[in-house]
């Protein structure tokens, strides 16, 4: 019996060694942790339960039958983050460069199936050279099996991808279908075709970092939701994100202890809005002063900065935040911000996370670039996302809410539950200057008369009270009481029940 137990320990030690000490050292020299080191940092200490440690590939071509390491280049299992269950796979670059084989894919599919059955998130730590060429079509089939599970799990359990090394070719499509993608600066990259292929086909010379590095995907392509300096920071931030999220669409997000007064008065908010209507201010200041303990987890902060998305807590409960940012493009909606916010709203709705919308939007960004790029359909995505959402929705208009953008930003007409406005709010078809130039075109030559007309328009329409008279605004509130009013609103909506008409699925304007 003793010999059998010792053999088990020996086999485990070999499996845990991955590709061997030399390759582990090479991994460390690149500034990267190993697959198992990453899992140890991600999960609560001692909570990891591994599956399929001894699985080996079945390929016999190209001499592969003589090289069959245990685990086949991926570590899979489950554990806990702050006591809550998650499933995880971590690709091992020290074994065949983390390349995906048939059995490698089967290990990933197994934990994804278990995650869906048991209602727990899946976190993928990606560090792979792509498909294992020696296995040919079997490797491609493995990718497709994973893709299908990504699709089936979408909206059922949170899926998080962390790119911690190469992720190229077919490998990119699995992360692309997950809810969140995060990257590590300087050591990770994602692209469908690499620099060599790009050069061959287009004669364009580009580095892997320029083509698919963290900066590219967080600032330009919007493929990634965030980037971190190293593996340790990335894994810490993933733990923090998971703490905001429900385990599945069948369970609520966790309620965490809070020590912040719900009725806290923030007098500084009474002077947040500048006297000059064209002067910007930082909407993040309002978000931080509403949130419990000023804790805000921002999503896609480096992309489409004219709109802010992320998570806060109110009375310990998770709330998704969408807010126009007057500091960038005056808070205008455009193609990128509409796509960014629409995807975030749909995630929140899929997982029953209430949505707080903070509005200061002068309209949609004009220009041929926007029109040629399809701003009509992209803007409709955000409109569609808000309109179909059945979760509690609370909206606060701080300053401008003009034209169609007013409708889009979680207005009362899109089944907003509580729609508040500050006294500084201006809810109108357009600003006073544009309106008077259209309404009183014949008087444009008389500057004094036009100025008087503009002042008349401002007094009559550029305020929250016309909308409040019609019931489109539930209450005009004092800025300093925003946290209290918003918290009370969400508290009253905890038992909200709202269902959309039965359909196979919607047809959002993609």
Swiss-Prot record:
Domain of life: Bacteria
Induction: Transcriptionally regulated by PccR. Expression is dependent on the carbon source supplied: transcript levels from acetate- and propionate-grown cells increase 6- and 10-fold, respectively, when compared with succinate-grown cells.
Keyword Ligase: yes
Region ranges (Carboxyltransferase): 1-504
GO molecular function term, any single one: propionyl-CoA carboxylase activity
Pathway note: Metabolic intermediate metabolism; propanoyl-CoA degradation; succinyl-CoA from propanoyl-CoA: step 1/3
CoA carboxyltransferase C-terminal domain location: 264-504
UniProt KW keywords: ATP-binding, Ligase, Nucleotide-binding
Record domain CoA carboxyltransferase N-terminal: where: 1-257
Family: Belongs to the AccD/PCCB family.
Summary of subunit composition and partner proteins: Probably a dodecamer composed of six biotin-containing alpha subunits and six beta subunits.
Protein's name in the database: Propionyl-CoA carboxylase beta chain
Organism in which the protein naturally occurs: Cereibacter sphaeroides (strain ATCC 17023 / DSM 158 / JCM 6121 / CCUG 31486 / LMG 2827 / NBRC 12203 / NCIMB 8253 / ATH 2.4.1.)
